[in-house]
Amino acid sequence: MLGARRLLGALRLCSSVSCPRPRASAKMRVRDALRVQDARGECVTVQGWIRSVRSQKEVLFLHVNDGSSLESLQIVADSSFDSRELTFGSSVQVQGQLVKSQSKRQNVELKAEKIEVIGDCEAKAFPIKYKERHPLEYLRQYPHLRCRTNALGSILRVRSEATAAIHSYFKDNGFVHIHTPVLTSNDCEGAGELFQVEPSSKIKGPKESFFDVPAFLTVSGQLHLEVMSGAFTQVFTFGPTFRAENSQSRRHLAEFYMVEAEISFVESLQDLMQVMEELFKATTEMVLSHCPEDVELCHQFIAAGQKGRLEHMLKNNFLIISYTEAIEILKQASQNFAFTPKWGVDLQTEHEKYLVRHCGNIPVFVINYPSELKPFYMRENEDGPQNTVAAVDLLVPGVGELFGGSLREERYHVLEQRLARSGLTKAYQWYLDLRKFGSVPHGGFGMGFERYLQCILGVDNIKDVIPFPRFTHSCLL
């Protein structure tokens, strides 16, 4: 019966005199079992899913994986086990002796004494087929099952390791982690691409809405971090962000994760750029150190040549050009762009990728953008008629924009005038108040986490580096 637990048998047969006394068996993750250097027949129990089955005359070989590593643990069983019950994708619990492997392919193997099938897997109905390398596009149809493949397993382990590495970098450098709200009445980016939130059933009574003001899913934690930067000199947040962008491009999602930081007493973009570059390199080096096999799988089967490109990024200092210089480079390019580069017009993805190639595929900071292209909170440069702001974007190979940041406008009267011109004074009076009471020069940045993963792994489509992608016309599960 489907899902029924079945005990398949024992490898060790009882002797003619007596059966050996049952021994205590320690549960062990596959990753930990594979790391044992001097296996001497310890009795262990492993739980996981069958990745392969190979039957010979007198011996049965299984490979079991529990998600803790890319590599699976080889299980060796004798012919008393019924191989028909052990199918690809089934969940099992195996008890046996961990011994040194006779094969050069692995260091250890598990000699099975008991194999228990926990959950069957019907091979014909299972969309993931044995020994088949499914394209990532195909797997997107099955968000509830695709994590069982090697490719998605590796991507998600890298994602987990990168998350830990980011927290480690900020903790080691004295940043305070702030939980910024998911529900907000602010539009940080000013783009209007917001998801408005309302109760599923309308509130009865005189109040027009649950919060008495329109509420939205956050597009950024920046403004809340700026509040905190009035009490803590270094803060960061790392959480979900939402944009109602009607786009199905390879670079955009409706729900994604942002790493954002705010630093007080910062007076130059150079200080911000240093932190951005350090964060990128420290995180990447930790990922490469802690899960090299997973990164290698992505580089080998998803993005050939990505390993060399990544090493090139890590060993070189990031470059810096101004927005004005970037426009001049684009104007002189022999490439025909779909969007003509022009001063005062935002850079498009095609422009960003060209600039990175022009800079030798080294990440490049583009600084000092025209003020009309950027939100009200960015600090105005004192550069006369150009009227630019102290903004910075980091462009990286294969992706384009990865980081965006700026110095914040800390001067009360300048900010007051910008809010007035935008008709936002009433909505952001609290933000002006921050400049009244102990204001300091400060700045910050945000990094799209999924784009970061695309960059280091070479994954072309952003929908393949997040467990459950949400985008226009798609919210599966």
Swiss-Prot record:
EC annotation from Swiss-Prot or TrEMBL: 6.1.1.22
InterPro entries for this protein: Aa-tRNA-synt_II (IPR004364), aa-tRNA-synth_II (IPR006195), aa-tRNA-synth_II/BPL/LPL (IPR045864), Asn-tRNA-ligase (IPR004522), Asp/Asn-tRNA-synth_IIb (IPR002312), NA-bd_OB-fold (IPR012340), NA-bd_OB_tRNA (IPR004365)
Stretch forming the transit peptide: 1-14
Presence of keyword Acetylation: yes
Gene Ontology terms, MF aspect: asparagine-tRNA ligase activity; ATP binding; nucleic acid binding
Domain of life: Eukaryota
Main location: mitochondrion
Catalytic activity: tRNA(Asn) + L-asparagine + ATP = L-asparaginyl-tRNA(Asn) + AMP + diphosphate + H(+)
Class in the EC hierarchy, top level: ligase
Compartments where located: Mitochondrion matrix; Mitochondrion
Keywords: Acetylation, Aminoacyl-tRNA synthetase, ATP-binding, Ligase, Mitochondrion, Nucleotide-binding, Protein biosynthesis, Transit peptide
Residue list for modification N6-acetyllysine: 353
Pfam family, one: tRNA-synt_2
Summary of the tissues where the protein is detected: Expressed in brain and inner ear, including the cochlear epithelium and organ of Corti.
GO biological process assignments: asparaginyl-tRNA aminoacylation
Annotated family: Belongs to the class-II aminoacyl-tRNA synthetase family.
Binding partners and assembly: Homodimer.
Role: Mitochondrial aminoacyl-tRNA synthetase that catalyzes the specific attachment of the asparagine amino acid (aa) to the homologous transfer RNA (tRNA), further participating in protein synthesis. The reaction occurs in a two steps: asparagine is first activated by ATP to form Asn-AMP and then transferred to the acceptor end of tRNA(Asn).
Protein name from the UniProt record: Asparaginyl-tRNA synthetase
Organism: Mus musculus
